[in-house]
Amino acid sequence: MRTLLLCFFIAAATNGQAHEVDNIDYDLYTDGTAWVADGKKAQGDVTIPSKIEVDGKEYTVVGINSNAFSANESITSVTLPDNLKYINDEAFSYCYNLENINNIPKHIENLGENGRIFYRTKFLDNGIKNEFFVFSDWLIKYTPQGETAKVTVPEGIFGISAYALTDADNTVVLPKSLRAASVLAFNSDLKYIDTGDNPVYAYKDGILFCEGTVTFYKNERELKDEVSVDGMWADVIFNNAVKNGVLLIPGKVETAGNVVKQVGGVRKGKLPGLTCEKLIVDEGVKYITDHAFRFFEPLQYVDLPSTLMNIGSWAFVDAKIESLVCRMPQPMNVPYYFVSYIKKFNSKVYVPKALLDTYKTTETYWNLIPAENFYQIEGNVPESGILASVKPIESVGKATVKAIYTLNGTKVNSLQHGINIVKMSDGTVRKVINKGYKNR
């Protein structure tokens, strides 16, 4: 199965050298490719060649960089090269007189992240008069032609650009052909996504998941720490994913053909203004990448699973976390900026009892947190965080359920509706609120 790097900004290699051809500057690379870097001197009908020759060497034009033609009011049409694969953010934004794009490739790998490739152009103004404005194999914008409860994205669409479906707030049906969708593509109040027979997308409880490859830095921001991970990623989180102030990232999700797949992590993305105080990441999830919950200030309680292996430096930047529960079996090597924000807000950190002293004395960045801010998990998780236990209690850490009691001390065989007292095999005791989960 083909997987796709779900990152909506493609940056060319860093060995680029600039060279001008016919009033267009190109960045040249040692792999024989060229990117349009600056076309602000171009005028009228512009043709971007498929290949350019510099000092006897031929380069294939594969991309147009961010803002390359931005605010050029002199161009009226652009003919694209046959080998074009990437167009980055705002490449043609504010080109007010740009009306025609010719020789559009049948397939584009990436159309930027912010959805403003053709912002404030005649080309876009004309395109959005149609119900579905499609550029190459990307949906640029859906425009309602009347009231509809369900929007079906046409088959053959490879990618959905940012803001393409913001006018759809009920149900969206994704095509089998879809392999890429911006985290900003949808209305945050969208009620449901039908992924149908799509083999790489899945939707569960207000979260859109996508199977693919994500490249990120492991713990620190050095190239030697860069890793690429294949898996199923929590990609877009909608408002209805939050239940009673709690956002649960599940450990498993069902895809087409009733295939259950493990959720590998939460991808770099932007939350659509959720009102959420508590985040629970279920067992099985291994990665929380950079910016996954950045600027999410209402977040006060975070519960991390024992399976977690990596947190991005900026994963929780500016989230005013009061209580952080770390169920990992040993102090994870975390990045400096993650710990610095935990320290900044004087957060309480709850860890397994056996690791309490280890966290206080570790040589990792955890030692930046005052020793008095560490607490053992059993019996000390704050009341404000008890709702974290809405996830199946059998999946919390490696301990198993030994006995379940009601509040009045009566022993029962399974979780009852409401508050339960649960004794675990490791000797810990937990309060668990059951809102419908059945004992597995």
Descriptions of predicted regions:
Residues 386-440:
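C-terminal outer-membrane/trafficking sorting elements
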Residues 3-12:
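Sec-dependent N-terminal signal peptides
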Residues 23-32, 41-63, 72-86, 95-112, ...:
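Structural signature of tandem-repeat unit edges
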Residues 16-20:
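Boundary at the C-terminal end of the N-terminal hydrophobic targeting segment
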Residues 316, 337-342, 363:
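A structural signal for leucine-rich repeat
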Residues 66-68, 88-91, 115-117, 163-164, ...:
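Consensus positions within tandem repeat domains that build extended binding/scaffold surfaces
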